[in-house]
Swiss-Prot record:
It comes from Clostridioides difficile (strain 630). It catalyses: NAD(+) + (deoxyribonucleotide)n-3'-hydroxyl + 5'-phospho-(deoxyribonucleotide)m = (deoxyribonucleotide)n+m + AMP + beta-nicotinamide D-nucleotide. Coiled coil: none annotated. The gene is ligA. Belongs to the NAD-dependent DNA ligase family. LigA subfamily. This is DNA ligase. GO terms for biological process: DNA repair; DNA replication. PROSITE patterns: BRCT (PS50172), DNA_LIGASE_N1 (PS01055). Pfam families: BRCT, DNA_ligase_aden, DNA_ligase_OB, DNA_ligase_ZBD, HHH_2, Nlig-Ia. The active site is at K112. GO terms for cellular component: cytosol. Gene3D superfamilies: 5' to 3' exonuclease, C-terminal subdomain, 6.20.10.30, BRCT domain, DNA ligase/mRNA capping enzyme, Helix hairpin bin, Nucleic acid-binding proteins. Its EC number is 6.5.1.2. GO terms for molecular function: DNA binding; DNA ligase (NAD+) activity; metal ion binding. Residues 584-673 form the BRCT domain.
Length: 674
């Protein structure tokens, strides 16, 4: 086989496994085997750079770091849109449109994705370059970074020059996961999904961008006049055929009343989406009518952006409290006079750290503006200083831990104030909360209040004590009772069978989160092998550096930690990796996209999601034309409505449990079609 054929074969194989992993959630090979294929391809491409293809999967992992971004002059200016803030603004826009082209007007309404706007250029069927919007005329060349975004095709079946505009974003779920990783590594949290997406694309090192779970929706062919297309909606369908990701939510509207109705629906329901939108974009659909209307110096006359009302509210800080995390970090929070914000009642907001409080000059009794960063995390936006009365009180971070009274420290170069007493009850409590959490040992019935009771009653002192609890220890606790006590004991007992990665993550080793725990569990057959591994051995693992490796080694050197592990072993907690020895489950949902909505009678949402994913399905957060079926419980809401509108199959929990008993994907399809 020639080198060229070898490279082509490797690319074909890797692309196949990427499809299985990213789009079907049904991998056929291990991460280790996948990495071996990638390394082999990288090696061949480095030896024969003339044979490297534009669509090589190695372009997805990022190239060499840049010193700076070069500038690109946009062939077609990336204009901004004029804004509408009210129904009257939209009706005025419609009136202006009709003055140009008459009453026979059709509009396309799309989400205004809250991300970073980019332009993509393709030539001869290959991705050529990509740039930020910049000032609309000149942008920054971020081609290398854009090539790492998996939803951007690097090859398309179109030999013409094609210029596409899109919005790079990060989903709410992935935003939460990235911030959880930041917290585990004691790094600053990102304020909102847009900042994370924009910051990720502007990294000078593309390998850092490649690690961020970025996505894109494309929404415009900038050189549409070179194509035989009559409408904007046709262009979106064409882009989708080429392999671009197009938001399925766009709607063709026959009148401005229909436009307004669609906008009102999404104003109320945008919180159900797994990504941020900050408005809706309204465009004249007909291309000839657009040409008749033309442009102003700054924006097209045939489009307008409707901005959702700002999600900000005024309230008062009645107190500032601090909490101790499981790593000892002391975090301040503002206690607020309750206020309705983005659909929920907000009574507290994060203040991050001492520097944040100083920078914004925040005091107790201040009147402030609050918002939900990314509609997720309540935060203090600014102090309304003109409303100060003189009763405001300065806040100082505590010099002693509020729980154990040991001195606190702030290391040079760090923003966090910490309690370094490893026996601090607050750290122990947070550590146990982490141990039982969904991404660790996943023990149902052990909420924060129960854990606090168990600690206060001296029933437990560390995580291993959970497995020595008897029913009589807990049955008389507040809000417990016979049934709850039985459920709790059963849940604890069930968790003994968990895979090794859950235990490793639950132990709370500094810098080791879910992903690193899975890497350890895959590369070592049991916990004893992990414990005896040297830092040199650990550094050889993919994505492990010296800091993570040393953290693992140091953790297992501590007698206190080893005592806990020995107690866990003695009581029968699994310490072996089940990666290759677990029960085989047929992939009956392979390639299917399944949406969960509402409250199920007996199953928890996460359990149902795990059942779907274990069987090869993908549990998605929004209903679209590609959804296979919707699993609906009580109070299903807008997702159920949309599924019915699109003709998507809807089943209840009882039918879902019947599907789990089937032995093949074909059987599932037959049942769904019946």
């Amino acid at each position: 086989m020639s080198v060229k054929d070898e490279i082509n074969k490797l690319i074909e194989t890797i692309n196949y496994h990427n499809e299985r992993y990213y789009n079907q959630d049904s991998p056929e090979i291990s991460d280790y085997e996948y990495d071996k294929l990638m390394k082999e391809l990288i090696s061949l491409e480095e030896e024969h750079p003339e044979l490297k293809r534009i669509d090589s999967p190695t372009n997805r992992v990022g190239g060499k770091p840049l010193d700076k971004f070069n500038q690109i002059v946009h062939k077609t200016p990336m204009l901004s849109l004029s804004n509408a803030f009210s129904e009257q603004d939209l009706r005025d826009f419609d009136k202006r449109v009709q003055e140009y082209v008459g009453e026979n007007v059709e509009y396309v309404v799309e989400f205004k994705i809250d991300g970073l706007s980019v332009g993509l250029t393709y030539n001869n069927g290959e991705f050529e370059k990509g740039a930020t919007r910049g000032d609309g005329v000149v942008g920054e060349d971020i081609s290398q970074n854009l090539m790492t975004v998996k939803s951007i095709p690097l090859k398309i079946n179109d030999k013409k020059e094609l210029i596409v505009r899109g919005e790079v974003y990060i989903s709410k779920d992935n935003f939460r996961k990235v911030n959880e990783q930041q917290e585990e590594q004691e790094q600053p949290l990102f304020a909102n999904p847009r900042n994370l997406a924009a910051g990720s694309l502007r990294q000078l090192d593309p390998k850092l961008t490649a690690k961020r779970p970025l996505d894109i929706f494309v929404f415009n062919m900038e050189n549409i006049e070179e194509y035989d297309l009559e409408s904007h909606s046709e262009s979106l369908e064409y882009l989708e055929k080429l392999g671009f990701s197009v938001s399925q939510s766009y709607k063709v509207c026959k009148s401005i009343d229909e436009v307004i109705e669609h906008i009102e629906y999404w104003t109320d329901n945008r919180g159900n989406l797994d990504y941020e939108i900050d408005g809706m974009v309204i465009k004249v659909n007909n291309i000839k009518q657009r040409d008749e209307m033309g442009y102003t110096a700054k924006s097209p006359r045939w489009a307008i952006a409707y901005k959702f009302p700002a999600e900000k509210k005024k309230t008062k800080i009645v107190d500032i409290i601090v909490e101790v995390g499981r790593t000892g970090t002391i975090t301040p929070s503002a206690i607020l006079e309750p206020v309705r914000l983005a659909g929920t009642t907000v009574s507290r907001a994060t203040l991050h750290n001492e520097d944040y409080i100083r920078e914004k000059d925040i005091k107790i009794n201040d009147t402030v503006l609050v918002q939900k960063a990314g509609d997720i995390i309540p935060q203090v936006l600014e102090v309304i200083k003109e409303e100060r009365t003189g009763d405001e009180i300065d806040f100082k971070m505590p010099e002693k831990c509020p729980v154990c009274s040991e001195p606190t420290i702030r290391l040079e170069g760090e923003a966090a104030v910490k309690c370094i007493n490893m026996s601090c009850p607050a750290q122990i409590r947070r550590g146990i909360i982490h141990f039982v959490s969904r991404d660790a040992m996943n023990i149902d019935g052990l909420g924060e209040s129960i854990i606090t009771l168990l600690l206060n009653e001296k029933i437990i002192q560390d995580v291993s004590d959970l497995y020595y609890i008897k029913k009589e220890d807990v049955v008389d606790l507040e809000r417990m009772g016979e049934k709850s006590a039985d459920n709790l004991i059963n849940s604890i007992e069930k968790s003994k069978e968990n895979d090794l990665w859950r235990l490793i993550n639950g132990l709370g080793i500094k810098f080791i989160g879910v992903k690193a725990a899975k890497i350890l569990a895959y590369n070592f057959k049991d916990l004893d092998e992990v414990i005896s591994a040297t830092s040199e051995q650990l550094e050889e693992l993919e994505e492990f550096g010296s800091i993570m490796a040393n953290s693992v080694v140091e953790f297992f050197k501590e007698d206190k930690n080893m005592n806990v592990i020995n107690k866990l072993k003695n009581v029968g907690v699994n310490t072996k990796s089940l990666d290759n020895t677990g029960e085989k489950v047929e992939k009956i949902f392979e390639g299917m996209k399944i949406v969960l909505t509402g409250t199920l009678p007996t199953l928890k949402r996460n359990d149902a999601k795990e059942m779907i994913e274990k069987r090869g399905g993908k549990a998605t957060s929004s209903v679209s034309k590609s959804t296979t079926f919707v699993l609906a419980g009580e109070e299903a809401g807008s997702k159920l409505t949309k599924a019915n509108d699109l003709g998507i199959k809807v089943i209840d929990e009882e039918r879902f449990l019947e599907l789990l008993k089937l032995s093949s994907k074909d059987e599932v399809k037959a049942v769904l079609e019946s």
